[in-house]
Structure formats: C-alpha cells, structure tokens
Amino acid sequence: MTNVLSISGISKHYGKIHAVNDLSLEVQPGQVFGILGPNGSGKTTTLSIVLELVRADSGTFQWFGEHPGKESRKRIGSVIESPNFFPYLTAALNLKIVADIKEMDYDDIDRVLKVTGLYERRNTRFRTFSFGMKQRLAIASALLGNPEVLILDEPTNGLDPQGIAHIREIILQVASQGTTIIIASHLLDEVQKVCSHVAVLNKGTKLFDGKVSEVLSVSDCFELGASDPVALEKWLHTHTDIESVEKKNGIFQAFFKARITPADINNGCFRDGITLTHLSERKRSLEQHFLELLEEKNDQTP
C-alpha cells in the first residue's frame, strides 16, 4: 500500500531554534493521524513544510508516493491559519470565491455546507458567525472538491465545548467516508477521541508514533487497597512486572509492564497473605502516556 504521506529526515531551524529536528513519519490511506505536542513542538511547522508553505532545511517528503507538485496539491484540502473570509459576503458566496480560486464548479458547495452543519446559514454574512461557525466554514472550504486528504491545524483551538463537539463530529463523519485526515493539536483528549494514529512531538523531536490503541493498551493500571497497606506497598515494590507505583488517599496505583488480569493480582496477593479491600482496573489515558514521554525526554536532556 502506497503511503499518503512519507516524511524522511525533515529538519527546520530558525536561528538556534530547532523547530523540526530530523523528523520521519508515514501516514497511510484512511488514517486519522494526530500530530500531538505542546506549543512550540513543531506541529505547525511540519504541516507548513508538507504543504510547501515553508521550505525545510534538509530532508524530503512525498505525497502519494511521488514528489510534491500541482497534481498532489489538488488532492489535499487544508486549514492552517485562522478563518479569513470576506466579512460582508454570505457563507455561500465566500465558498464560490474559494471554488473559483481552486478552479472548481459550484456543485459541491451545498454538500460541504451540509457536512459542516452550515447549510441553513448559507445566506448569512460571515461577519455574524461565531468563531466556531467560522472554523466550520474554513473546513467546508477545505472540503470543496472532495479531497483525499484533509489537513487541520489546531481545529478546536479557542472553541467552547459545543464548538469542539461540532468539529469532532465533522472529523468523524469525513473520516468515515475514507478521507485521510491529519490533525495537529495540543488537546490530548480530542486526539484520543478522533485519531487512529498519533505522533508525539516535543521541541521539534519525535518522541513516539503509532496506533492510539497501542498507546492506551501499554502498561495496564490498577488501583489497589488492602487491610494491611504496608504489606501491600512492599509487595508492589518487589513485583518485577510493575513499572511504577503511586499512592494517593490510601489507594495505590500500579502500572504493569505486561498484560495482567485482576484475578492474577488477587491470587498473587492472596498467596503472599495480603487481603485486598479494593481492586479496579484503569486504562492508561493518552494524557498519561504523553506526560511520561515528556518526562523521559527531560530526564535525558543534559
């Protein structure tokens, strides 16, 4: 299967700042690929490079197995900056201008307005739109022509919970039709909800990339309590399959390196004379994994 996007060893420096540092990624057809990281991690610079808005200092990238060019650009829709349309024109008229720029006919305008939930407001002037509606109109403009790839840079930034939910619904709907979506975001919860794959960046360096499901399945977390907490704590710290242990309000959180069941834990404690009073399983969130990756990176920095 040919990758939709292949990035190989891309770097971009602004003076002494390493915006992107030797980055390599692969995005395959149909993936919802999240590029996750704090502000200044290189997300927007990476997207700007692959959209040919910024030139990399080194490295290469390909779209659809070929070097980038006019034909590949026609297959990509993107929203990189804040929505910017003519304020006194309606949503439909603004999209007609975008269609003219893209050399497309107007047949697709009603479809993208319906996808983004703006069809009933198609004859409303842009200046009266809320910020969330403006963001949705920007996505509608990117969807004109039904591109194979949709690129969104911080699509929910600055939105209220309702606006975030609207954008999430649009992303999931577009993805369900087979469109490959690449999203840059610092909102871990939203990435976890919509993305199938994720790459974690920090200060221009990739810390991780892979399936979101794999991230969430690593190191099962269990909450444990016992009638003898001292004995339980000793047991947890001597267990070779436990990665880390935290204690809060008399309850221990244990992260296991390998897959383990509650029955395994209960039996192990019982054999060693420990009676558990509390045992529950908690899946590791993307946020936990993200923070651990950043902590590991900081520990490695001289």
Region locations from a protein language model:
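Short, charged/small-residue-rich alpha-helical element at the C-terminal edge
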Residues: 221-293
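ABC-family P-loop ATPase nucleotide-binding domain
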Residues: 1-11, 296-302
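Short low-complexity, flexible loop/linker segments enriched in glycine and/or proline
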Residues: 199, 292-295
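Conserved NTP-handling cores and scaffolds of large molecular machines
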Residues: 102, 240, 297-298
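Short loop/helix-cap segments at secondary-structure boundaries that form the rim of catalytic
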Residues: 71, 216, 235-236
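Active-site phosphate/pyrophosphate- and oxyanion-stabilizing loops and adjacent acidic/basic residues
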Residues: 96, 213, 234
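ABC transporter nucleotide-binding domains
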Residues: 4-5, 12-183, 188-202, 208
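Conserved beta-strand-loop-alpha-helix hinge in the C-terminal portion
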Residues: 205-227
